[in-house]
UniProtKB/Swiss-Prot annotation:
It is an enzyme of class 2 (transferase). The gene is rlmE. Pfam families: FtsJ (PF01728). Keywords: Cytoplasm, Methyltransferase, rRNA processing, S-adenosyl-L-methionine, Transferase. It comes from Cenarchaeum symbiosum (strain A). S-adenosyl-L-methionine binds at residues 52, 54, 72, 88, 111. InterPro entries: RNA_methyltr_RlmE (IPR050082), RNA_MeTrfase_FtsJ_dom (IPR002877), rRNA-MeTfrase_E (IPR015507), SAM-dependent_MTases_sf (IPR029063). This is Ribosomal RNA large subunit methyltransferase E. One of its GO terms (cellular component) is cytoplasm. It catalyses: uridine(2552) in 23S rRNA + S-adenosyl-L-methionine = 2'-O-methyluridine(2552) in 23S rRNA + S-adenosyl-L-homocysteine + H(+).
Amino acid sequence: MRPLDAKKDHYRKMAREQGYRSRAAYKLKELNKAYRIIGAGFTVLDLGCAPGSWMQVAASAAGNRGTVLGVDLEYAEELNHAESMRGDVEDESLAETVAERLGRADAVICDLSPQVSGNWSVDHARQISLNYAAARIMGRVLAPKGNAVFKVFDGEYAAEFREHMGHMFSKTKSTKPQASRKQSSELYLVCLGFRG
């Protein structure tokens, strides 16, 4: 984003004013308001959690009786009712580590993005690959009837990923929150009612 655009970015300004770690908080707030992905008392797994704005929203939605565990390659500062750990979603052992630490989750939220190279085909394929890795972890920890949301770079492989997730959930819906930049190719795949 150009510096001039950043100054005009309404959500970035609001995030700073309201104490969120990034503008991404408003994406999850909007999605949760529309689809009730996270409710009071929920146990939530946040994959790709850094810098932690989704952890902030999840901890608020889950409330005092809820638990949030964030996982990322980078460190994300912990909050009340939200812990974080370093981990790579592509590491085969991470699912077991998360299951031991968290138990069953009521919701899995995933805002993963690769280091963007500028080559759209490569970046899109890499992001979808990360989603498949996250979905494997989700399959290990998400409780039956649980919910999930995944960032998806729209493109060649997005429909295949949506179809894959559609087999695991009662309902799936692709949507673009108002807080997403208009020029961004990102969509969010909301998945409700895990069939376990």
